[in-house]
């Protein structure tokens, strides 16, 4: 399988979901990501309301590594990666309560934002 490339993120139309929503864009055929494992991912994050990118590991050319369930990633991102298989690409829509809530970690993310991530699982 060829190396993944940075995806374009298509924000779904309509109202932002109020629950964590995951949709496999590509189903991987490698190991499954489970709590306690260290996942290595590339991702793009945009806000649901504007579709504007607020963060991406692709531009840093450095995958993000985190322990599933370890508290290093926002809750919805962490939960959304669980169950992915290496080689997969998944859209994860994170409601505010599982994202940054009423806080704003950056001017690019207004308080109360629903977040949309497209995540490629590189390894566990």
Where are these regions (language model features)?
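Cross-family detector of peptidyl-prolyl cis-trans isomerase
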Residues: 1-124
């Amino acid at each position: 399988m060829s190396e993944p490339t940075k995806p374009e993120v298509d924000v779904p139309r309509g109202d932002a979901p109020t629950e964590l929503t995951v949709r496999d864009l590509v189903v991987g055929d490698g190991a499954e990501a489970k709590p306690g494992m260290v996942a290595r991912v590339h991702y793009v994050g945009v806000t649901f309301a504007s579709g504007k990118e607020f963060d991406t590991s692709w531009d840093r050319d450095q995958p993000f590594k985190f322990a599933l369930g370890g508290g290093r990633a926002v809750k919805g991102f962490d939960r959304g990666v669980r169950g992915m298989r290496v080689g997969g690409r998944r859209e994860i829509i994170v409601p505010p309560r599982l994202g940054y809530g009423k806080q704003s970690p950056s001017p690019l993310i207004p308080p109360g934002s629903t977040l949309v991530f497209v995540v490629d699982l590189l390894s566990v």
